[in-house]
Amino acid sequence: MATSLPLLMFPQARTIPPPKGRPIVIGQPHVPGHGKQVERLDAQLTTLQQDFERYKASVSGSVAGLEPETVLVIEIAGSVNEFRQAVEAIGLEWMGEWDIDDIPPDEDFFERNTKGERTNKAVKGRMFLSLGNEAGMRELLSLWEKWRDNKTLPSGKTKWRDVFNQTVQIRRWGIEEALRETGMLDRWQDLLNPINPAQAIRFQIELFYRRSEDRRRQSERNVATLLHSRSGDQKGGAGALSIMAIHAVKAELPAERIQQLLNELESESHDTDIQLFKFHGVMYFRPTGQSLAVTEDGEGVDTEIAEGVVDLPPIAAILDGVPNVQHQALKGRLLLDDPDNLSAQYQPGDRKHGTAMASLVVHGEMADGQADPLPRLVYVLPIMQPDPHSMNRSEHVPDEVFFEDRIARAVRRMFEGEGAAPAQAPTICVINLSIGDPSRPFIHTPSPWARLLDWLSWKYRVLFCVSAGNYPEAIDIALSGTDYLALTDPKKVEHVLKCIQAQLSGRRILSPAEAINAITVGATHADNGGNYYQGQRTDLLPGAS
């Protein structure tokens, strides 16, 4: 039957020739000459040396057997091919690289148009991360001195010539990236005001992934020691998925230690005595136990529910909260698999998000009265549970649990089984994931969660459909309410869209929506729910969809 076919249809692959006309020449951006680079980088490398010496002195004796190392951040304009070999040739450990497209242009670094003329566009480049000890730092400085003095670089290390030519900045990875860029300092500042100083504050520590398992275990031991030195603790085991280069631990510290950190960073030195926050093995500090799904109270729309027996095996799955399987619209249409009995954590009225998503998958927008329900069962495996400590018992993954682990285990259970249980849903083709991490906007590189989806998609040949939530913050329209309301509707839409465009750097997609192998679902400024009461709200995009 046609209704039993897969829901997705893809066109035949075909080769599309490039458009005719003048070819676009993509070249390297302008960089300063040798003399100016020597002047610029000499100061940066001197600062780098001094920072590393201070770090060595500060960690001396803090952890037995800890070898002082540092993660170098090298930002370059343009690109350098095959740089990894050059990094490893001088004893540094390659940690990764990613594109950057927001280097401010200046007289030294700028993009050129097809005529070779300077433009005011942000400069595109690459960011390289490498980890090195004192010997690696000495080798780096030796190469720098040779390049500075116009001497030939040793064989196998000549790529450093290109790097020094194109380097915008070289520095140590530090508190700016690990704490400030992730928003943790602002989050803790807001959190601590009414908190008892002795209360434990939980968070997640993402570690730089080391290829050696021994080094990964040593990083965990070092973190545990540094936590204990400040009356903190590691919660549960570490999470490590080698195939995706993920390594993290759950941790907690007394609120007074977090307050100490904030006070010290606001002091004249802008430094802290808490070694955990300066440990070279830490990539990011992030919140844990976040609410991953947003639901709103409201009345449903009355509509007719199609009846009939559904017994065809599922090809669609949902990873979400526990749905109400006895709901009139869902009864007999879901195949619920709850191996951890998360259903027992729910009270009446808690099953909101899972029920809403199951209804959307099974029926679509029922208010339009056009879509027929799916003729197949839909497989549902809960990965969230209510948070008993939140005011509205919002659904989350508990502090001590890695949600990457829950997702990996859920998908493995579908296709391979678990323990004595066989594969629970091997016919699945599409997995719906309508949750996102509000604390993890996309920055630089795909998150561990996104990388996990990419790998699971490849391993099990399954498609993830990700809808990671709406941007929750206010939109700054740069006008008073009176001035805005005086505009015509088309001008309102035009003005608001320009304001949103200007704020795009802060309006990033939420993890895991940046997954490459997944379909990321956007939203339109319209639905089929009919009229609704706006109250004091103003429609910023009147007539738009």
Model-inferred region functions:
Residues E304-D338, A344-F403, A425-T427, P441-F442, ...:
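Subtilisin-like serine protease catalytic core
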Residues I195, L241, A306-V309, G369-A371, ...:
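A general structural signal for short secondary-structure junctions and capping/turn motifs
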Residues A2-A57, G61, P68-V73, I90-Q199, ...:
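Autoinhibitory propeptides
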Residues R187-L191, A255-R257, V294-I305, V362-M366, ...:
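Short alpha-helical segments and helix-capping/turn motifs at coil-helix boundaries
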Residues Q218, D387-A515:
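Substrate-binding/access-modulating region of protease and related hydrolase catalytic domains
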Residues L207-R211, L253-R257, D320-P323, P382-Q385, ...:
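Short, flexible loop/turn elements at secondary-structure junctions
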Residues L72-F83, E206-S219:
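Short, surface-exposed ligand-recognition loops at beta-strand->loop->(often short) alpha-helix junctions
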Residues V322-A329, V493-S545:
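Extracellular S/T/G-rich loop segment that most often corresponds to the catalytic His/Ser-adjacent loop
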